[in-house]
Amino acid sequence: LQPLFEYTQQSVKLVFLEETIHHKPDTLLGIFKKGLQFGHSSGGASILDLHSGALSKGERFVNIFTNPETKNIWSETELASYIDAKETIRRAVIENFGLQLEAIHLTSPTFFSRMTDNPAKTVHDEYWHPHVDKETYETFHFTSLLYLSDYGSEFQGGRFVFVDGDHMNRTVEPRKGRVSMFTSGGENLHYVEKVTQGTRYAITIAFTCDAQHAIPDPHVRN
C-alpha cells in the first residue's frame, strides 16, 4: 500500500488508493442499491447496515431482514466481495498502525451511506457537524471509509474534512475506490461538507480493539 496522503502529528491520518479493491466499488455499490429499493431517508442521508439490518426509511430506521421480499437478495458472491474489501482494509489498518494481526475486529455500526442535497428531516440527516467518532460510538478505535463515488463528477460538496488543532483543516476528496483510515478518538475531529449536488456513496468500516464488541460478517439469510 502506497499512501496517497499522510499526515502525522498528534494522530495519524492515511488515505490510500487501494488497487486490490479497485474492481469492487461497483459491486459494493450494487449491494447498497439493492437495499435502497426497500427504503431510504426522506432527508439527505440514508444508511444500510448489512450486519444489523438497519435501513433508513422515511424519518426512521427499519430492519430490512424482517421484510420477506429481501430474502436472498444478496448472493454469496456479493457478500464475499464485501467481506474481502473489509478484510483488505482491516489488514491495511494493522500494517500501517503497527498492530498485531488479531488486534482489531470489525465492530458496529459498519454501514453504507448515501448523501444527497435533500434538506434534513431528522438529526440523523445532519452529517455536516464536526464530531469525534469515539464519542458517538464508544466501541470505535479505528475508522475507515471506502468511497464508492467520485467527487466533482458524481457529486459536489461532500468532502471529508479533518479539523486539526493547528487551525488548519485537511481535506479528503472522495474518489471511487479510495480508502481513508484514522484513529477514532478526539485527535481526529472531523466533518463532511454538505452535498450540494449529485449523490455521494461510501462505506464506513469500523474496528475495535475489544473482542467483546466484535461483530460477525454478513451471510446469506435463508
PLM features: residue spans?
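Fe(II)/2-oxoglutarate oxygenase catalytic core
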Residues: 1-182, 186-222
